[in-house]
Amino acid sequence: MTTAQGRTGRRAGPGRAPQTEIVVDGDSVQAVDGISLAAVLVGERRWSLRRNPVGGDLRGPFCGMGVCFECEVTVDGRPGVRACITKIYAGMRVETATEGEAPHDR
Amino acid sequence: MTAEHSAATYGEVVERDVVIVGGGPAGLSAAARLASAGLAVTILDEQPELGGQYYRRPAPAVARQWGDHRPEGGRLIAQVRAAGAECRTGHLVWGVEDDGRTLLASDDAEHPVRLRARYLVLATGAFERVFPFPGWQLPGVTTPGFAQHLAASDHTTVGDRVVLAGSGPFLLPVACSLIELGVSVAGIAEAGRPYRPSLRALGTLGHPARLRELASYAARLARARVPIWQETVVLRADGRDRVSSVTLAAAARPARPVRTVEVDALCVGYGFRPQTDLARMLGCQVRVDVASGDAVPVTGAAGRASRADVYVVGEAAGIGGVHAAKARGLAAAHDILTREGRSAVPVSEARRMMSARRRLARFTALTDSLYPGPAALLATLAPALPADTVVCRCEAVRAEEIRTTAAGSADGDLNATKAWTRAGMGPCQGRECGFAVAGLVRSVMPGRGVGDGESRVEIFPSRLPVRPVPLATLLELAGPESQKGDA
Ligand SMILES: Cc1cc2nc3c(=O)[nH]c(=O)nc-3n(C[C@H](O)[C@H](O)[C@H](O)COP(=O)(O)OP(=O)(O)OC[C@H]3O[C@@H](n4cnc5c(N)ncnc54)[C@H](O)[C@@H]3O)c2cc1C
Ligand code: FES
């Protein structure tokens, strides 16, 4: 299990703010209740969320405002959820899609 | 979810006096005024909370622990709710029905919603202007706005060691937000030379409001010893699965490296572009601003578009900052109330508002003039873009392909280039690459586009849906028959 506490210094420490537990690719992750899913993932330094369907290279959140679709993940079985405009809640199950082909030479 | 509404089996229909798309400063200002005057108002936003970009709300747990960075936003939202406006968050407005007046939306459970109103107010805001460079698609490369949202509303750092780059005043407050969270900002690369002779000199210019604000950011950055590299642009970002370094170049010679900096995040943006797709889809006239290459709706003083029942307000009507956005929202509300014969605005208040808006416009022009204009930027950056740079992130289309197609089969036509190469055809609808693709096309066919008279300026057209719509929504919208057939 990774906890935000362990990342203090890498991201601003969670202090006493109430924490919520979500599950990311099977790992239990603690984060401040109600923040955006993109913030949880970036705070954990889990940047790669998917592969580009054309080139196969890894992608992560870019615009942070719902425009680029680079942060799409599957949430509680629903695909194509933009992590940057989604707030976390207790028990949320998140799947990224980073498996698969490595990108061709670039 | 705030508003009570049942998810009808297909196509819930909403009829109101006023429907407002976008719950940022502009939409909220309009909603508060209209609803408190007694009109039936619905305000929609695709985000889970109202607030838009500037008033993006921190999670309650964050606000309690670290404070609310913009409490006035919370107050404005509360005012809108108290006035009785129906607030629909998690609602994406993705298109317009064939009748040209019914908005098509999907709610937070992906059910379709149709909305009709006597007045439509479009307050869809802006998105960031980006320009590609090799490696910009690496995880860890983001817009400055993303870093700002992470810091301000989620109290999360985008990285431990960050370079900010691009152009415009927005880079300074973002750098300050990062420093406040203990991030090491290795430097700010600004494409222009706005800070003369030094950053601190801004404060002596004697212009209140926006410039003084800039000067205070500048002072904080100077104290934190954050270098500002002027006339400097990103040459490329490197890293395996994630960005690990950025190489910078002089803006005048964008292909020659001058410095490489190790980073774990890189945030690059060149200001903002108005989000005008819904206005265009509703048939509102737009003009292309020659200096920026952006589409701007043609509006009257109160934001009334070429269609009398449609208003475009806030940054969707042109970039001008939060105060201008709020003033435009209010002006539209007043215009609607006057047309409705309700509580006409006293002449003195109207006059005050007019002069406030003129003052704001002057400040915007002044700040804008400090930074290189987007068209000038394109003219230097586009020709220097290396051939194998991924320009369209969605469809992975490279610079060379765009240049070759533009000069060849597309004969310098932007939309033909798009159709041939698929650049701009992905889920972001060309919002991320549109600026660059236009620049590339222009750079190989200098006879076309901006600088050649307004009639020849080209931008990607607005396309339905404005964002990908869940299949479930479309099926439900089409009615039970289509779902049966599908099962
Ligand atoms: C990422 C980002 C961060 C920014 N941060 C700052 C900052 O820190 N300080 C600053 O001074 N300025 C900032 N700005 C500039 C900002 O745009 C303005 O200051 C201000 O927010 C503009 O207000 P607005 O009401 O016009 O639009 P916005 O605040 O952008 O609000 C528009 C709203 O419309 C919604 N919307 C758009 N299209 C649709 C649709 N089709 N369906 C449903 N909803 C839709 C959006 O979700 C958004 O909430 C930022 C801009 C961006 C893009
Ligand atoms: S980061 Fe761009 S849509 Fe989420």
Language-model features: locations:
Chain B
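Residues forming the flavin
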Residues: 2-421, 425-427, 431-487
